[in-house]
Design a protein with these regions (language model features):
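Acidic, mature catalytic/reactive cores of soluble proteins
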Residues: 1-184
Length: 184
């Protein structure tokens, strides 16, 4: 019975966009006061996605991968900075206004500490690999848009410096180099 109740809770947490399940909300309890708990967090969706993959609900994971990939270029760009094309949002949710559905993203603007979500894209790539291994849908991973996005992620993570927001203002040690590890 506990496993069935966990599956029921997972099903209640599904977020839909254009009639398709695209993720899960962080919490289903409306009494929870955190403003963003109705959102799907990229990193936190991965355990749910693994359950969906193990139970044959592959479409939810594929919908998530596609939706999040297309959200990557939506981040607000601060003056003096440029858009980091491989960056993914920390979270997203769907709003309905005037009969239209719209996906609203958070690239760290509403997060605790306002930290840029640099790990989201890695979780997306890990989940992409799990999806392909589980489903055998290699064609999805080989699509031109998916390959282009993987290239953007690798470009983001392999460049010498990462600039999307003024992180040193929040972490003074990073600005002075005090947080560097000793290298042999």
């Amino acid at each position: 019975m506990p496993i069935q109740s966990a599956h029921d809770l997972l099903n209640r947490s599904l977020i839909y966009y254009q009639g398709r399940p695209v993720g899960t909300a962080a919490a289903c309890d409306e009494r929870v006061s955190a403003a963003n708990y109705n959102e799907c967090f990229i990193r936190d969706f991965v355990p749910s996605a693994l359950v969906f993959l193990m139970t044959g609900r592959h479409d939810i994971v594929r919908n998530f991968l596609e939706t999040v990939m297309h959200l990557s270029g939506h981040q607000h760009v601060m003056k003096g900075h440029r858009r980091s094309m491989g960056l993914m949002p920390a979270s997203f949710h769907v709003v309905r206004e005037d009969g239209e559905e719209k996906v609203v993203t958070d690239f760290g603007d509403r997060a605790i500490g306002r930290v840029t979500p640099v790990d989201s894209a890695m979780w997306w790539m890990i989940l992409l690999r799990a999806y392909v291994v589980t489903t055998g849908d290699q064609a999805f991973a080989e699509r031109e848009d998916v390959q282009g996005y993987i290239a953007n992620i690798l470009d983001l993570y392999l460049r010498e410096r990462f600039e999307s927001s003024p992180t040193p203002a929040f972490f003074p040690a990073a600005k002075s180099g005090d947080c560097r590890r000793s290298r042999p």
